[in-house]
Structures are given as structure tokens and as C-alpha cells.
A protein has these predicted regions:
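Channel- or pocket-lining gating/hinge segments that regulate access to a cavity or pore
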Residues: 206-326
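Intrinsically disordered, low-complexity peripheral segments of secretory-pathway and membrane proteins
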Residues: 19-74, 80, 268, 275-337
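Soluble non-transmembrane domains of integral membrane proteins
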Residues: 19-211
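Bacterial N-terminal signal peptides
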Residues: 5-15
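Generic detector of short, well-ordered, non-transmembrane alpha-helical segments enriched
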Residues: 14, 60, 144-145, 254, ...
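Short linear sequence elements within intrinsically disordered, low-complexity coil regions
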Residues: 13, 70, 75, 197-199, ...
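A generic membrane alpha-helix/interface feature
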Residues: 67, 81, 115, 153, ...
Length: 337
């Protein structure tokens, strides 16, 4: 069952009790324990795969197997009636009206039916595949850790009407997930009250989550290493004779343009966010260092052309020492803060 176009509904259902004369229509709107305490719902999720975490779109793509289970005494039958298990379309029976609120296009891969045993135990099984929204905190990118939630909410029942069992669990073989860019750790499920606005009506909610730690080795080779090579080129300009103007200016100017182009192209891989990531700080500090290096080269060229060649050479020697020291400080400030 799909709610609107963006919301996936995990529907749970209860069949009718033939001996009591109840019909499916009699049971679709009333809770099994109406007038008493809340009905207890058990949710089990098997995380089969996390195919991708998309930083730019802020979604992660999952493959899930879901089981939702609860008890309805109205559906119990004696041992001489019917088969061991009965199957019902979920639209014909009561269910706790569950939806995944961060769904962004999950697909149903199994029939939408409920299975009921003789004791009135109801189980709905479904396999889901598709994207889920996630609010990524990229301040420490690419050395960041993200919480990937699966947020389940009843859009009709409050916490006083249904509760989620402590037996609800997330099961997964984390070492077998296909995404080599991340390492994962499953968290315990948490029940909560969901509200659209402060003081509004509350709905029963249950969150499953996985902590994902980014493997930074890829970014060391694609960001830090190219940036270091560009800065090394800027540093080498200080080793040229101070009166070799074309080579020194050409080298310094090339590093500035290369660094700006590289930083812009790298930033396009991230979403439009209102803060700077650790990688952004690294690019900005490195660009500032290259601009300072260019300014030093301009000064030394100017001095060398106005009978201050000795002072120009001393400044160039100082720059040779200061440049790697400042770059080391940039790395420490950016990635160890």
C-alpha cells in the first residue's frame, strides 16, 4: 500500500473469526484490544544490503526484509476448523497503519498479504528496496560518521493505542554489505513519539538505525594527494633563482588556478549546505597558502629588480622553510580538530 507517492506503508492485517460470526469488514477499524491497553507490535527488519550512500542527494539505498507481528484474539480458531495458517489481503483486515516517514521511493517486492495462525498471531512479510532520506552531518567530511535511520510511524494510532515490543530488532550481516566506502554498526531500536509540530497529536514511532563510518582512504588519494602535489609545485617556485621571473611567476600562477579549479570541482560532489566541511577548510587554507606564496614571489621579484637581490634571496630561503611548516599546520588543524 502506498501513501501519497513518497510514503511506503508497512500494512499489518488481521483476518476475521468465522466461528464468532465476525467478518473482515467488522475488524478493519477496531483494534484487537480496543477499550483495554495498547496493542503490542513487534517489528523485525533484516538489512540485506546498503547499496549506496549518496552525499549530494542525502539519501541511502537499502534492501530490506520486514516482518511485522501482533496478536488478535478475535482471529483465534479451534483446532478442528480450517488449516494451520490462513492468508488475507491486508486491505481487508485491521492493521496498525505503519509508514516509513523517510521513504523516498521504496518498492514492494512481495505480495501484500497477512498470515494468521490458529492462535490469532498475525504476521506481515515484505521485502523493500529503494532510497531513504537521511540528514547528513558533513562537517567532518571525509572523516565523518553518519546515522542512517529507518523511521517507522503509525499514522493513525498514538502511543496509548499501540506500543512497539522490546523484541523488535534489526538483523544484518554488516561485514557482507556491498558498500566498501563505509563500515557499519547496528544500533538498538528506539521507540518514540512522533509529532509534526510542537504540541500536536503524537503518533507511535520506532526507529532502527545503523552507524556508518566513512572509509577515508579514497579521499586521501583523490583530495589530499593531488592537493599536496599542487602545493609542492608552489613550494618549488621558491627554489628557483629570484631573478628568473617568467619561470617563477608562471609556476606560482599555475598553482593558484589549478587549486581553485580543483577545489570547485571537488565541492560539486557535495550537497549545497550552509557550513564548511573539513575538506572545504583544507582547500581554503591550502588556497590561502598558495596565494601567500604568490605574494612572496612577487615581492622577491620586485626586490631583485631594485638592487635588493640579497634581501630577496633571504626571503626566498625563509619561504622554503616556512611553506612546508605552514602546510603541516594546515593538515593538523583541518583533520585533527
Amino acid at each position: 500500500m502506498r501513501i501519497l507517492q513518497a510514503i511506503f506503508l508497512i500494512s499489518l492485517a488481521l483476518p476475521a473469526n468465522a466461528q464468532s460470526g465476525a467478518t473482515a469488514g467488522d475488524l478493519t477499524g477496531m483494534r484487537p484490544n480496543a477499550g483495554g491497553g495498547p496493542d503490542e507490535i513487534t517489528v523485525g527488519i533484516g538489512l540485506l544490503d546498503i547499496a549506496e550512500i549518496n552525499d549530494r542527494e542525502q539519501v541511502f539505498t537499502v534492501d530490506l526484509y520486514v516482518e511485522v507481528e501482533w496478536q488478535d484474539p478475535r482471529l483465534a480458531i479451534d483446532g478442528d476448523t480450517g488449516g494451520e495458517l490462513r492468508t488475507f489481503p491486508i486491505d481487508e483486515i485491521w492493521h496498525p497503519r505503519l509508514t516509513i516517514i523517510n521513504n523516498r521511493g521504496l518498492d514492494f517486492l512481495l505480495p501484500e498479504v497477512a498470515t494468521v495462525d490458529r492462535q490469532g498471531q498475525v504476521i506481515v512479510r515484505q521485502r523493500l528496496s529503494g532510497p531513504l532520506a537521511v540528514d547528513l552531518d558533513l562537517r567532518k567530511f571525509p572523516f565523518d560518521t553518519q546515522r542512517l535511520p529507518i523511521e517507522i510511524v503509525s499514522y493513525e494510532y498514538s502511543p496509548s493505542e499501540i506500543t512497539f515490543s522490546e523484541n523488535s530488532q534489526l538483523v544484518t550481516a554488516l561485514d557482507e554489505l556491498n558498500d566498501d566506502a563505509w563500515s557499519y554498526e547496528a544500533l538498538d531500536p528506539e521507540s518514540y513519539e512522533y509529532r509534526l509540530r510542537e504540541g500536536g497529536r503524537s503518533a507511535a514511532g520506532l526507529t532502527f538505525a545503523v552507524m556508518a563510518e566513512r572509509e577515508a582512504a579514497y579521499y586521501i588519494f583523490t583530495l589530499a594527494l593531488p592537493m599536496t602535489l599542487i602545493l609542492f609545485l608552489a613550494w618549488m617556485a621558491h627554489w628557483l633563482p629570484v631573478d628568473v621571473v617568467p619561470a617563477r611567476m608562471g609556476t606560482a600562477s599555475a598553482t593558484v588556478f589549478s587549486l581553485i579549479a580543483f577545489g570547485v570541482s571537488f565541492r560539486l560532489t557535495l550537497p549545497k549546505i550552509a557550513y564548511l566541511t573539513a575538506a572545504d577548510h583544507f582547500v581554503l587554507y591550502s588556497t590561502s597558502l598558495v596565494l601567500i606564496s604568490l605574494a612572496v614571489i612577487v615581492v622577491t621579484i620586485r626586490w631583485a629588480s631594485t638592487d635588493r637581490k640579497g634581501a630577496a634571496q633571504r626571503l626566498a630561503r625563509q619561504a622554503r622553510v616556512a611553506f612546508p611548516v605552514l602546510y603541516s599546520l594546515i593538515v593538523l588543524l583541518t583533520f585533527t580538530a
